[in-house]
């Protein structure tokens, strides 16, 4: 692409981007928010231009054009600085769809232009995606998504991608479903690609991307690839389809649509569609050659995003959907071939009042000046340069076998999930039986078609051979001048040959009609009627299955909700049981501590009482000792007193040991108290003895006094008598 053309495209795409953002500027973010296919294509176009400009000598030109575009009269550069505000309170400032789109696109574009080191890109994207998570958590806009362009992805290591994936996988409250799916795809794709020789490669400019599995449209949009880019595939991949365009919405709704696709027969394509800016452009890769167990995106519900983004399904809730039969196969675009002429001046069948959809399209070919060819009816199959224009669904007969296999696989899966005794067991068995019968009939029809084609080839060869013989006979006839019998014989042979040729032509015409009926024609034939009946039956079964799937989805949704409630209740019950066990442990420990405290308190009170009693007893013992000492001084026989004193000292030592040990045996204390009582009794007895001794001593003293008085009186009397006698 020349630079001038790139700058012109960038100018147009920047204007389209500014117009789209301005239109969405006041749409508040919510759980129903999502980007339409038109908006996603506008974003892809401007990011592609910036990516392509990186390989030119004016790589900042496209980015400057984008920055100078205006939104509501203000340049995008200034608007971006205002809503970004240096990363302060971003989730409150970016509250509409338009601001969200502007914020993401400008961040990616600036990163593409200014960053080339993987660590720098990773650091920027880490901060950026944390802001995105904050926005999604605040507004619950789970269907909003603008993925990383391929120009940045190719610079990141797998470790960086896994770390960015963890930003979303650990932020459960962010509701960034599509970002999580995007990084999950990159992770799965990396490990599958590293261990496989199978690949599908898409490239434009300086970027390329390879994958061995199906690639959904929103992944291709995020990576900024289009169906006009260079596509390559490995030779082992046979059933590869590239979806290129949305034809119309199905059943007048936007929940599903009919798409055009190209089957990739060749290993390399310089684009399979024209490079346009149409709003209904689509690009997705369907790979039916790889094992379905490793390809989670071949399901049509996941491969092609509905127009209303909030109606898209997640992998966990997506039912098997392979309605590829409704989509239209078209030929790959070749820029070297002239475009077909659509205005021929010939009145089309629908112009006469017929239905355009039901009328066969007539192809008008340029007249040939050759006289012989002019009088012959033109047979397109004999024209080697004939390229048919397909106006409705054209699926190879062999692909019906693939679809039937998928339907049987789907029914087997439904039967496994519903169980052997499920409600729909009979319907499933009936559907499988009819599919098996249809498969057998289809195989029979295929064999008949192949036989007819072989017969057609044989008849064609025979016709060519007879034509050659007729021409030789004509030459012989024209070369004879006489009227011999050989001329009559030759005429007869020619007539017979012509009759045989007419019969062969008639047979060939019938065969061609039958083949046209099988492929795409409207000629009534047995095979056509059978196929129409089978299609009607398949559609009816599809409707029935869809209704049952809706019922099942509702039941599963309710069951899932109940399971979540039960799981939460179980979790709360488990937490409650743990709390009860913890409380019980604490109560037990508190009771133990209270009993120990009470015991210690009782022991302390008892010890205090015992100490007081011991102090009192000590004082009493000391008093007894003092009295015993006094008694000892007043009594000559001190043997019993010494025994009591030693016994008291012994008791005192025991009491002292008891006090020093911080307590004592209450029984021993009681015994000691009783012993002390005995000692007190003995002491009292001793006291009684001392009193008696004192009384006796006083009596002795009195008697001694009387004796002394008596002695003195006797001495006095004796002296008196002696004096008297002398």
UniProtKB/Swiss-Prot annotation:
Full protein name: A-type inclusion protein A25 homolog
Any one GO CC term of the record: virion component
InterPro entries: Pox_A_type_inc (IPR007596)
GO process terms (BP): viral process
Ranges where the record places region Disordered: 342-361
Region (4 X approximate tandem repeats): 426-713
Major subcellular location class: virion
Domain of life: Viruses
Sequence repeat residue intervals: 612-634, 639-661, 667-689, 691-713
Composition bias, Basic and acidic residues: 347-360
Keyword Phosphoprotein found: no
An example Gene Ontology molecular-function term: chromatin binding
Family to which the UniProt record says this protein belongs: Belongs to the poxviridae A25 protein family.
């Amino acid at each position: 692409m020349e630079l001038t053309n790139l700058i012109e495209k960038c100018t147009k795409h920047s204007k389209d981007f500014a117009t789209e953002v301005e239109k969405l500027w006041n749409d508040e973010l919510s759980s129903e928010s999502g980007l339409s296919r038109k908006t996603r294509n506008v974003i892809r176009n401007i990011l592609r231009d910036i990516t392509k400009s990186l390989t030119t000598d004016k790589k900042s030109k496209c980015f400057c054009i984008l920055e100078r575009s205006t939104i509501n009269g203000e340049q995008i550069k200034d608007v971006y600085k205002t809503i970004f505000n240096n990363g302060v309170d971003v989730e409150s400032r970016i509250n509409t769809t338009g601001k969200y789109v502007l914020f993401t696109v400008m961040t990616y574009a600036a990163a593409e232009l200014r960053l080339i080191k993987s660590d720098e890109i990773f650091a920027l994207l880490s901060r950026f995606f944390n802001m995105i998570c904050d926005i999604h958590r605040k507004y619950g806009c789970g269907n909003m998504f603008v993925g990383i362009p391929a120009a940045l992805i190719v610079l990141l290591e797998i470790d960086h991608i896994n770390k960015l994936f963890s930003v979303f996988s650990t932020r459960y409250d962010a509701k960034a479903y599509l970002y999580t799916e995007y990084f999950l795809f990159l992770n799965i794709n990396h490990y599958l690609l590293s261990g496989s020789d199978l690949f599908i490669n898409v490239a434009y400019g300086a970027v390329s991307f390879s994958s061995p599995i199906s690639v959904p449209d929103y992944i291709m949009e995020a990576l900024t690839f289009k169906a006009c880019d260079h596509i390559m595939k490995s030779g082992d991949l046979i059933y590869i389809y590239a979806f290129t365009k949305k034809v119309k919405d199905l059943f007048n709704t936007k929940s599903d649509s009919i798409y055009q696709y190209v089957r990739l027969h060749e290993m390399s394509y310089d684009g399979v569609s024209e490079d346009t800016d149409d709003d209904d452009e689509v690009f997705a890769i369907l790979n039916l050659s790889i094992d379905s167990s490793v390809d989670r995106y071949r399901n049509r519900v996941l491969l092609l995003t509905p127009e209303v983004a909030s109606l898209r399904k997640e992998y966990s809730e997506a039912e098997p959907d392979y309605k590829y039969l409704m989509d239209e196969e078209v030929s790959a675009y070749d820029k070297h071939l002239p475009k077909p002429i659509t205005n021929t001046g010939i009145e089309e069948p629908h112009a006469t009042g017929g239905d355009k959809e039901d009328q066969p399209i007539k192809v008008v070919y340029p007249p040939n000046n050759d006289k012989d060819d002019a009088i012959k009816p033109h047979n397109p199959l004999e024209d080697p340069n004939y390229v048919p224009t397909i106006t409705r669904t054209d699926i190879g007969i062999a692909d019906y076998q693939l679809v039937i296999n998928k339907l049987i696989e789907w029914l087997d899966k439904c039967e496994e999930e519903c169980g052997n005794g499920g409600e729909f067991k009979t319907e499933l068995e009936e559907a499988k039986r009819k599919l098996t019968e249809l498969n057998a009939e289809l195989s029979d029809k295929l064999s008949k078609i192949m036989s007819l084609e072989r017969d057609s080839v044989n008849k064609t060869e025979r016709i060519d051979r007879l034509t050659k013989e007729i021409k030789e006979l004509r030459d012989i006839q024209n070369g004879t001048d006489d009227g011999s019998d050989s001329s009559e014989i030759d005429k007869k042979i020619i007539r017979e040959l012509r009759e045989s040729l007419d019969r062969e032509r008639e047979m060939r015409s019938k065969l061609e009609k039958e083949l046209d009926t099988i492929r795409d024609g409207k000629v009534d034939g047995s095979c056509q009627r059978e196929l129409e009946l089978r299609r009607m039956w398949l559609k009816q079964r599809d409707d029935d299955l869809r209704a049952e799937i809706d019922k099942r989805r509702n039941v599963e949704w309710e069951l899932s909700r109940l399971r979540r409630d039960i799981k939460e209740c179980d979790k709360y019950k488990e937490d409650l049981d743990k709390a009860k066990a913890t409380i019980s442990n604490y109560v037990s420990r508190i009771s133990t501590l209270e009993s120990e405290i009470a015991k210690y308190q009782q022991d302390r009170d008892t010890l205090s009482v015992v100490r007081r009693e011991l102090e009192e007893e000590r004082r009493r013992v000391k008093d007894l000792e003092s009295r015993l000492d006094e008694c000892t001084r007043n009594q000559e026989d001190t043997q019993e007193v010494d025994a009591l004193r030693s016994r008291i000292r012994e008791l005192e030592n025991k009491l002292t040991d008891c006090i020093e040990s911080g307590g004592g045996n209450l029984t021993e204390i009681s015994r000691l108290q009783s012993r002390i009582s005995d000692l007190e009794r003995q002491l009292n007895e001793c006291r009684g003895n001392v009193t008696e001794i004192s009384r006796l001593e006083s009596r002795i003293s009195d008697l001694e006094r009387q004796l002394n008085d008596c002695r003195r009186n006797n001495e006095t009397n004796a002296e008196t008598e002696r004096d008297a006698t002398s």
